[in-house]
Structure formats: C-alpha cells, structure tokens
Amino acid sequence: MAKKSMIARDAKRKKMVERFAAKRSALMAAFNAAEDPMERLEIHRKIQGLPRNSAPTRMRNRCWATGKPRGVYRDFGLCRNQLRERAHKGELPGVVKSSW
C-alpha cells in the first residue's frame, strides 16, 4: 500500500490537470499556429506561467485498489499483484488463464 500522502498528492494533481486542460490546450494550439518568433516566445511564457502540476506529464498511474505506482496495467487500472489475485478469483470479466 502506498503512502496516503502520495495518493492524495496525485489526486490533487489530477484535479489541477482537469482544471487547466482547456487553457493549456488553447495556449498550445496558439503556440503551434504562431509563426512569429516573438509571438511564440510570449505564448511560451504564458504556458510557463501555468501551475507546474497542471501539466499532464506530472501525473502518475496508480493502482486504484492499493495506490501502488509501479506495475500498473492501463487496461484495468490495477497493479500486477491485484490483477493476478482478481483474475484468479474471476472478478475480471474476459480474463482467462492461458493454456496452449
């Protein structure tokens, strides 16, 4: 189980990303469309002025059951240990033990 403070920090970052997503995407579109170097520099400064935690790259994929940050499968949102346990119990629809 991950520390509760780290889970809370990631939840806070997720909210921040959602709150600034529209503004950040509008600025990025303007930045990519601008051809004048001075205009691009001005837009870049505006992007840098946004909160650091509003960037989507600062979010971390975590297991929703345990909060572990590593070994998380995107399709399920579970870490490898939880995925294995729940698959053996039959709690994951469509997941079967392989045999060949």
From Swiss-Prot:
Keyword Ribosomal protein: yes
GO annotations of cellular component type: cytoplasm; small ribosomal subunit
InterPro entries for this protein: Ribosomal_uS14 (IPR001209), Ribosomal_uS14_bac/plastid (IPR023036), Ribosomal_uS14_CS (IPR018271)
Keywords in alphabetical order: Ribonucleoprotein, Ribosomal protein, RNA-binding, rRNA-binding
GO molecular function: rRNA binding; structural constituent of ribosome
Biological processes annotated in GO: translation
Disulfide bonds: none
TM region(s), chain numbering: none
Record bears the keyword Cell inner membrane: no
One Pfam family this sequence matches: Ribosomal_S14
Superkingdom classification of source: Bacteria
PANTHER family listed in its UniProt record: 30S RIBOSOMAL PROTEIN S14, SMALL RIBOSOMAL SUBUNIT PROTEIN US14M
Function statement: Binds 16S rRNA, required for the assembly of 30S particles and may also be responsible for determining the conformation of the 16S rRNA at the A site.
NCBIfam families the UniProt entry points to: PRK08881.1 (NF006477)
Family classification: Belongs to the universal ribosomal protein uS14 family.
Subunit structure as annotated in this protein's UniProt entry: Part of the 30S ribosomal subunit. Contacts proteins S3 and S10.
HAMAP family linked to this entry: Ribosomal_uS14_1
Protein name as it appears in the record: Small ribosomal subunit protein uS14
GN (gene name): rpsN
